[in-house]
Curated annotation (Swiss-Prot):
Protein origin, superkingdom: Bacteria
Protein name: Small ribosomal subunit protein bS20
Membrane-spanning intervals of the chain: none
InterPro entries cross-referenced by the UniProt entry: Ribosomal_bS20, Ribosomal_bS20_sf
One GO term (biological process): translation
Organism of this sequence: Prochlorococcus marinus (strain NATL2A)
């Protein structure tokens, strides 16, 4: 166990950062799931409202992924991979509807 005050503080900081990173990753996963659900809804019922909802969820997900990469929560390649998955899903849905 830590003996010095600085070591004890570092343990507290590491735990705080771990929880923040866990929360951030969870939010990214949730937003990605929402995007895929929005794709499914738009695929079944194409319309202006569902398309606007789809675009809004994609913008939120892309923004959150970029911020996670910027903060160092996600590796840049992981972020790029996730954004690519979302883009492929979006293009597939839009191509099928048109």
């Amino acid at each position: 166990m830590a003996n010095t005050n600085s070591a004890k503080k570092r343990i507290q900081i590491a735990e705080r950062n771990r929880l923040e990173n866990k929360n951030y990753k969870s939010t990214v996963r949730t937003l990605m799931k929402r995007c895929f659900v929005a794709c499914g809804i738009f695929e079944k019922e194409p319309g202006d409202e569902s398309k606007a909802d789809l675009q809004k969820t994609f913008n939120l997900a892309f923004s959150k992924i970029d911020k996670a990469v910027k903060k160092g929560v996600l590796h840049k390649n992981t972020g790029a991979n996730q954004k690519s998955r979302l883009s492929v899903a979006l293009k597939k849905v839009l191509k099928e509807v048109v």
